[in-house]
Amino acid sequence: MFKKFDEKENVSNCIQLKTSVIKGIKNQLIDQFPGIEQWLNQIMPKKDPVKIVRCHEHIEILTVNGELLFFRQREGPFYPTLRLLHKYPFILPHQQVDKGAIKFVLSGANIMCPGLTSPGAKLYPAAADTVVAIMAEGKQHALCVGVMKMSADDIEKINKGIGIENIHYLNDGLWHMKTYK
């Protein structure tokens, strides 16, 4: 999604949100990420301006004080940015890939089933279409944010094909954007 993303070319406009819209977004985030509720006022303080940065391909990035927090495509689910995920790693359930998959994940490749079932990888129970953080064997922080294309049980049984779709990874265009004023 952000492989060839460039802040100067892809951002079309920025809109400050009304408090009623912010409340709706906060409720949507609580529904989508149940563990975030007690931290939401710390992530999105009430008095700070919340803005939506609109980009090409119907991508919207939610920012507070210029810090990129969440993004979504069209009216789809929100995904946390990796910078937010590094501060609050408990927001998303984790899946772990083995060392051999790291360079492919960091180049934007989807996570294949064998990379999740081999020694060194850890596959935790999760349903299909769950938003997950991809961790790596021997690393502390998440490599990417992805969406489960199969359930964890199916990944173990089938062990072929794409297991997790890579949505946003370290050093992609969104990672390089850092802040937006």
From Swiss-Prot:
Residues 92-171 form the PUA domain. It is found in: Cytoplasm. Transmembrane segments: none annotated. GO terms for cellular component: cytoplasm. Keywords: Cell cycle, Cytoplasm, Growth regulation, Transcription, Transcription regulation. CDD domains: MCT1_N, PUA_MCTS-1-like. The keyword Transcription regulation applies. InterPro entries: MCT-1/Tma20, Pre-PUA, PUA, PUA-like_sf, Uncharacterised_CHP00451. One of its GO terms (molecular function) is RNA binding. One of its GO terms (biological process) is formation of translation preinitiation complex. PANTHER family: MALIGNANT T-CELL-AMPLIFIED SEQUENCE 1 (PTHR22798:SF0), MCT-1 PROTEIN (PTHR22798). Plays a role as translation enhancer and involved in cell cycle regulation. The PUA RNA-binding domain is critical for cap binding, but not sufficient for translation enhancer function. NCBIfam families: unchar_dom_2. Belongs to the MCTS1 family. This is Malignant T-cell-amplified sequence 1-A. It comes from Xenopus laevis (African clawed frog).
